[in-house]
């Protein structure tokens, strides 16, 4: 009975042609007997990064989903990968807040940035001068798992 993950998600309906958010028709919601609410649940505010560690990554074909956007799981890869093997060998995420801001499309380069203060890191994924995702992670130190990366 121990909770190992808690998730908050907000979903919207998007018009594929105009790429704009549109209202959900009441008859679509009715079968689910769900209350209608215009209120959006929001996660934490993410601070601007002042002096981040930064690494660029090329967006590859296999990073994409069927809509031609980068798959959501890839953002976490970029967030973790920039931390480096030495850190990741001795730390595991305890709490992750991840906000998807703007989709990343095929081709091009993204920049993964982070700043660390103690066991807390702030992250930003950006491309073409736009923020695509932001994250805040609380880490827990762990014993090395009996192997050393690259040795």
Give the role of each language-model region:
Residues 1-43, 104-106, 115-151:
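HotDog/MaoC-like acyl-thioester-processing domains
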Residues 15-92, 142, 146-151:
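Hot-dog-fold acyl-thioester-processing enzymes
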Residues 57-141:
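Acidic/His-leaning functional-site neighborhoods
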């Amino acid at each position: 009975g121990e909770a190992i993950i808690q998730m908050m998600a907000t979903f919207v309906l998007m018009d594929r042609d105009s790429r704009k958010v549109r209202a959900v028709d009441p008859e679509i919601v009715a079968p689910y007997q769900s209350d209608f609410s215009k209120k959006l649940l929001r996660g934490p505010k993410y601070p601007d990064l002042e002096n981040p560690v930064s690494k660029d990554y090329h967006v590859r074909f296999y990073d994409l989903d069927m809509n031609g956007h980068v798959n959501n799981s890839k953002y976490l890869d970029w967030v973790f990968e920039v931390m480096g093997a030495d850190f990741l060998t001795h730390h595991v995420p305890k709490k992750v807040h991840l906000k998807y801001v703007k989709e990343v499309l095929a081709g091009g380069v993204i920049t993964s940035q982070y700043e660390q203060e103690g066991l807390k890191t702030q992250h930003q994924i950006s491309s073409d001068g736009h923020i695509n995702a932001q994250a805040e992670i609380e880490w827990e130190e762990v014993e090395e798992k009996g192997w050393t990366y690259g040795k």
